[in-house]
Amino acid sequence: TIVIGFMSPHKYPERVKLMRERRITSFAMELIPRISRAQGMDALSSQAAVAGYKAAIMAADRSGRFFPMLTTAAGTIRPAKVLVIGAGVAGLQAIATARRLGAVVEAYDVRSATREQVESLGAKYIDTGVAAEGEGGYARELTEEEKRKQLEVLASHITRSDAVITTAAIPGKPSPKIISTEMVDNMKVGSIIIDLAAEGGGNCEVTRPGEEYDYGSVRIYGPFNVPSMLAVHASDMYAKNLLNFLTPVIEEGELKLDWEDQVIHDSALTHDGEIRHEPTRALVEGDAS
């Protein structure tokens, strides 16, 4: 038996253990390597794009303010100020969508290499002086000093924003806490936080994962499974990712797995009674450091 899909092995080690015991060959789509050849298979990116777009729409829908600038007989209305934290695929899509809606957008990411991408979308990049590029295009965890420096700079931008969208997540680890309770206390009346990192615990200290509620005068929403809210296109994109993964390994109607291929090697979770992904193996066998 072969299983392909999002496995979340760090969340469900017992599931991985069961697949190992039953000698199931499994491939985790979230383990697809970030290399040029595998871009069409990158389901994390395709679903993140859906989530980022939807986050901006949710922020605009729940905000008590217009996003674009309006000039009316009743006077001029200034555009909303939107802050996007995390400039990965989800963050960049949130920036682009908020800009299309007419908002003034600022963005921040610990990976300084994202500055050019942020500015190309018409947003202002916030430079905190902290750079934390990690492996595989992801951000690494910050030191305590880096966290302090980051929060000092971000605090003033957060309190001036009408909407904040957070997308900062580290695969297999809890989401970093970027927005403190004190920052939320100082936010504008009627402002909103959309926390896309809620499934990992959230980027905001007062996020209740899976819930939407008012914290004082600020609306906090930490949704789960955001891509399912745009099910048609999310499914189309995911199906294409799966097709692109399967096409190279199917010959004459049979599955031919080349374990020397980086995509196959890196995305394999279990095979032939073994856990092939080392961090997951360490977690399941109880010797994770």
Residue ranges of model-derived segments:
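Flexible, glycine/proline-enriched loop segments at strand-loop-helix junctions
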Residues: 2-6, 38-50, 85, 101-105
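Glycine-rich phosphate/diphosphate-binding loop of Rossmann-like nucleotide-binding domains
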Residues: 66-159
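Generic hydrophobic/aromatic pocket-lining and core-packing "Φ" positions
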Residues: 16, 56, 94-95, 115, ...
